[in-house]
Curated annotation (Swiss-Prot):
Residues 335-370, 376-411 form the EF-hand domain. Pfam families: EF-hand_7, Ion_trans. One of its GO terms (molecular function) is calcium ion binding. Each of the two internal repeats contains five hydrophobic transmembrane segments (S1, S2, S3, S5, S6) and one positively charged transmembrane segment (S4). S4 segments probably represent the voltage-sensor and are characterized by a series of positively charged amino acids. It comes from Hordeum vulgare. Inhibited by Al(3+). SMART domains: EFh. Residues 1-82, 162-176, 318-446, 502-510, 559-582, 685-742 are cytoplasmic. Residues 1-44 are annotated as: Disordered. Residues 259-273, 628-642 dip into the membrane without crossing it. Residues 104-140, 198-204, 248-258, 274-296, 468-480, 532-540, 604-627, 643-663 are extracellular. The keyword Oxidoreductase does not apply. This is Two pore calcium channel protein 1. The chain crosses the membrane at residues 83-103, 141-161, 177-197, 205-226, 227-247, 297-317, 447-467, 481-501, 511-531, 541-558, 583-603, 664-684.
Length: 742
C-alpha cells in the first residue's frame, strides 16, 4: 500500500456501533431470507450474508478512519477483524492512558526543584507555586512506567490485524515507534540521573495529537501552510526593519530617541511591541510631548501594521489554510466513497449497476441493528429510499448510494404517541377541548413568560435582601414558593393537554420537568422541615436552581428566527472549532514545558532583581513558570495579549539575556498571529455558511410544494459530526471543486 493510501474502516464508528449493537440481541427479519443473526459487527463481517457485511461497512464508513484496505482484501480477513475489534473494545483504556500522560505534566515535580534544592518545591509561598500535589521521583517513575506499558500495547496491537508488512509501511506507525523509543530512553535517563532537560513532556503532547484523528488532521493542515506563512512573515519582517530604522533615524536627537529609541536594537524591539499595540501609546508619549505632529508617524505605522499588514497576513494564510483543509476533506470523501462502493458491490451481486427498493430496504433493516441511531420504521425506510433516489426512477445508482451516510443520519420526526387519557370520555368533552386549546395557544405561553419575568424580579430582590440580611427576605421566599406551584400547574396542564409522550419529545419540556420537580421538592422540604435537614435549610442551592429556571426566558429569543439561527450556529461552531482549540492547548503545553525548563525557579520572594521588574510592580508574581499549572495560566494571559510585554521584559531582566525574547516572540507568532487569527477567520466564514444553511432549510420547510411537505415530515436532526461535515463542505465548496478537478 502506498503512503498516500488511506485507511478504510472507521475506528470511531466501529467502536460506537460495537457498543450499541454488541449489548443487545438482534431482532429477526431483514437482510435477506433465512439470514443468520449476529450480535457483533465483527461476526457479520467475517461470517454474515451480503446485507450484513454491507451494513457493517456502511456503518464503519461514517467517520472515515480505520484499518488499511489491504486487510479487507486479505484471505485472513475474519481473523484480522476479530483482533481489530478486540483492539477497539480497549479504546477506553487507550483514551484514559493519553489523558493520564497529559495529566502527568501537571503533577510531576518541576525539574528545577531537583536541580537547585531538594525541598524547594515544598516552599510554595516562597516560589509562588500552585496548589496541585507533586509526585515524588519514585511515584513519577511508577506512573510513567505504567503509561509506557499501555502505550506500547496500543501502538503494537495493530500488528495483530495489519501484519508487519502493512504496519511498517505507515509513516504514522514509524513515527510512533520512534517516539516510543525516545520516550523509553528519556525515562531511563531520568531514573538514574537528574538532568535539567527532558523530552518526555513534549512527546506526551505529540502522542495526544497523533492519537486524536481531528487533532492529527488539523496539525497536517497547519503543516501544509508553513511555507506560505514564512513568506508573509518575511514581508512583515522587512516592514518592521524598515519602520524601525526610520523611527531610529527620525527621533535620534529627540527625547524620544534618548529615552526610548536609544539604539537600533531597542527601537526594533519597541516597534515590534507597538505592532501588537500592547505599548500604545506609552511608547511614543515623549515624542508627542515635543510635537503633536510626531503622532502622525506612529498613527500611520499602526494603521499600516495592524489594520493592513496583519489583515493581509490573515487573508493569505486563511486562503492557504482552506486549500490545505480542502485536500484533507477530499481525501476523507474518497475514503468514504471507496467503502460505500465496496458495500454497493456486495449487494449488487448481479452487477446491474443499481440497487432496487427491496435491496435498499433490506440494507436499511440491517443498519438498524448495527447503527447507534434509534430503530427506524418501515415508513422511514421509504423516505430514506426516496432521499437516495434523486432521479425518481426507483433505482439507486452507485453515485446516489455514495450519499448514504448523510441520508441515514436524518432522524425522522415520529408521530407522538396518544395520551393515556384518550380512552376516557371526559377527555373529549367540550370543556377539556377548550382547556387543551388554551394550553396550546400563544396566550398560555405569554402568561408563563410573564410569570418567569416576575420570578426573575423575585430572585433578584430576594438575593439582594439576603446579602443585606434583611428580614423581608422571607416574604420573597414565600413568593418564589408560590411561583413554584404555578410551574407545577403548567407542567400538569401541558401533560394533560399533549399527553406525556408528546410532552417528553421536546427537549425544553424535559429541562422544565426535571428542574420544576427538583425545585418544588426542595422548597417543600425546606418549608416543612426548616431545621431538621441542615443541607436543605441552606437555601443557596435552591437559589441557583431558581436562576436555572429563569433560563427558560431564552425561549423568547428562540421565537425570533435570527436568534434561533444564532443558537444553532453557536453549537455547530463549537463542535467544528474543538480541533483547533485542541491544537492551541497542545501549543500551550509545549511552551509551558519549555518555560518551566528555561525560567523555572527564578521568580521567588527575596530575589533582588525581581523587585525591579514590572512583574513585581504589577503584582503578577503568581503568573510565573515555576510549575506547570502556573505556567499554563501565564500562557493564557499571553494568549489574550493582556500586557504580555510585562512578562517578556521581566524575564529579560531576570535572565539577563535577550535570548529569552525568542520564547515570547515565537509564542506570539505561532499562537496569536497564526492560530488565533485562523480561528477568528474560520468562525466568521463558518457563521455565514451556517446562516445560509439554516435559511435554506427554513425555505424548504415552508415550501408549499410536495417536496416541502416531505421535508416537513423529515425533521433533519443530525449528529454533531454530520452537521460539522455538512458545514465544512458548504464553506469549502469552491476549494473542493478545485481540488477534485485538478
Amino acid at each position: 500500500m502506498s503512503e498516500a493510501q488511506a485507511p478504510l474502516i472507521t475506528e470511531e464508528a466501529a467502536e460506537r456501533g460495537l457498543a450499541s449493537s454488541g449489548s443487545r440481541r438482534l431482532s429477526d427479519g431483514g437482510g435477506g431470507q433465512g439470514s443468520r443473526k449476529y450480535r457483533r459487527r465483527s461476526d457479520a463481517l467475517a461470517h454474515g450474508d451480503r446485507y450484513q457485511k454491507a451494513a457493517a461497512l456502511v456503518d464503519l464508513a461514517e467517520d472515515g478512519v480505520g484499518i488499511p484496505e489491504d486487510v479487507l482484501n486479505d484471505t485472513r480477513f475474519g481473523r484480522a477483524m476479530s483482533f481489530y475489534f478486540v483492539y477497539l473494545r480497549l479504546d477506553w483504556l487507550w483514551s484514559l492512558n493519553i489523558f493520564a500522560l497529559i495529566l502527568l505534566n501537571f503533577l510531576e515535580k518541576p525539574l528545577w526543584c531537583r536541580k537547585d534544592a531538594l525541598h524547594a518545591c515544598d516552599q510554595r509561598d516562597m516560589y509562588f507555586l500552585g496548589q496541585l500535589p507533586y509526585f515524588s521521583k519514585t511515584e513519577s517513575l511508577i506512573y510513567e512506567g505504567l503509561t509506557l506499558v499501555i502505550l506500547v500495547m496500543e501502538i503494537l496491537c495493530p500488528l495483530s490485524y495489519e501484519g508487519l508488512n502493512i504496519f511498517w509501511r505507515s509513516t504514522t506507525n514509524k513515527l510512533k515507534i520512534l517516539l516510543l523509543f525516545i520516550l523509553a530512553c528519556d525515562i531511563l535517563v531520568f531514573a538514574f540521573s537528574s538532568q535539567p532537560f527532558r523530552l518526555a513532556p513534549y512527546i506526551r503532547v505529540v502522542f495526544l495529537i497523533m492519537t486524536i484523528r481531528e487533532l492529527r488532521m488539523c496539525a497536517i493542515t497547519l503543516a501544509g501552510l508553513i511555507g506560505t506563512y514564512l513568506n508573509v512573515l518575511a514581508l512583515s519582517l522587512l516592514f518592521l526593519l524598515f519602520a524601525s530604522w526610520l523611527a531610529y533615524v527620525t527621533f535620534e536627537d529627540t527625547p524620544q530617541g534618548k529615552t526610548i529609541f536609544s539604539s537600533y536594537g531597542v527601537t526594533l524591539y519597541q516597534m515590534f511591541v507597538l505592532f501588537t499595540t500592547s505599548n500604545n501609546p506609552d511608547v511614543w508619549v515623549p515624542a508627542y510631548k515635543i510635537s503633536r505632529w510626531y503622532s502622525l508617524f506612529f498613527i500611520v505605522y499602526v494603521l499600516l501594521g495592524v489594520y493592513f499588514l496583519t489583515n493581509l497576513i490573515l487573508a493569505v494564510i486563511y486562503d492557504s489554510f482552506k486549500e490545505q483543509f480542502a485536500k484533507q476533506l477530499v481525501q476523507v470523501d474518497a475514503i468514504r466513497k471507496n467503502i460505500l462502493q465496496k458495500a454497493f458491490e456486495l449487494i449488487d451481486t448481479n452487477t446491474r449497476g443499481y440497487l432496487d427498493r427491496e435491496q435498499c430496504i433490506s440494507l436499511l433493516n440491517e443498519l438498524n441493528k448495527y447503527r447507534s441511531l434509534p430503530k427506524t420504521s418501515r415508513e422511514d425506510f421509504e423516505l430514506i429510499f426516496a432521499e437516495l433516489d434523486r432521479s425518481g426512477d426507483f433505482k439507486v445508482t452507485s453515485e446516489e448510494f455514495a450519499d448514504l451516510c448523510n441520508t441515514i443520519a436524518i432522524k425522522f420526526q415520529k408521530e407522538p404517541p396518544p395520551s393515556y387519557l384518550e380512552k376516557f370520555p371526559f377527555y373529549h368533552s367540550p370543556v377539556c377541548g377548550r382547556l387543551k386549546s388554551f394550553v396550546r395557544s400563544r396566550t398560555f405561553e405569554y402568561i408563563i413568560v410573564f410569570v418567569l419575568l416576575i420570578n426573575l424580579v423575585a430572585v433578584i430582590i430576594e438575593t439582594t435582601l439576603d446579602i443585606e440580611n434583611s428580614s423581608s427576605q422571607e416574604t420573597w421566599q414565600e413568593v418564589e414558593f408560590f411561583l413554584g406551584w404555578i410551574y407545577v400547574a403548567e407542567m400538569a396542564l401541558k401533560i394533560f393537554s399533549l399527553g406525556f409522550g408528546a410532552y417528553w419529545m421536546e427537549g425544553q419540556n424535559k429541562f422544565d420537568f426535571v428542574l420544576t420537580w427538583t425545585i418544588f421538592i426542595g422548597e417543600t422540604l425546606t418549608f416543612a422541615f426548616p431545621s431538621k435537614l441542615p443541607f436543605l435549610s441552606n437555601g443557596e442551592w435552591i437559589r441557583y436552581l431558581l436562576l436555572g429556571r429563569v433560563l427558560r426566558l431564552t425561549r423568547i429569543l428562540l421565537q425570533v428566527q435570527r436568534f434561533r439561527v444564532f443558537v444553532a450556529t453557536f453549537f455547530t461552531l463549537m463542535s467544528s472549532l474543538m480541533p483547533y482549540l485542541g491544537i492551541v492547548f497542545c501549543i500551550l503545553c509545549m511552551y509551558c514545558s519549555l518555560g518551566l525548563q528555561i525560567f523555572g525557579g527564578i521568580v521567588y520572594a527575596g530575589n533582588p532583581t525581581l523587585e525591579e521588574t514590572d512583574l513585581f510592580s504589577n503584582d503578577y508574581l503568581l503568573f510565573n513558570f515555576n510549575d506547570y499549572p502556573s505556567g499554563m495560566v501565564t500562557l493564557f494571559n499571553l494568549l489574550v495579549m493582556g500586557n504580555w510585554q510585562v512578562w517578556m521584559e521581566s524575564y529579560w531582566q531576570l535572565t539577563g539575556s535577550s535570548w529569552s525574547l525568542i520564547y515570547f516572540v515565537s509564542f506570539y507568532l505561532i499562537s496569536i498571529l497564526l492560530l488565533l487569527n485562523l480561528i477568528v477567520a474560520f468562525v466568521l466564514e463558518a457563521f455565514f455558511a451556517e446562516m445560509e444553511l439554516e435559511k435554506g432549510e427554513e425555505v424548504d420547510i415552508q415550501s408549499p410544494t410536495s417536496g416541502g411537505i416531505k421535508k416537513r415530515r423529515s425533521m433533519r436532526v443530525r449528529s454533531k459530526g454530520t452537521m460539522v461535515d455538512i458545514l465544512l463542505h458548504h464553506m469549502l465548496s469552491n476549494e473542493l471543486d478545485g481540488s477534485q478537478n485538478s
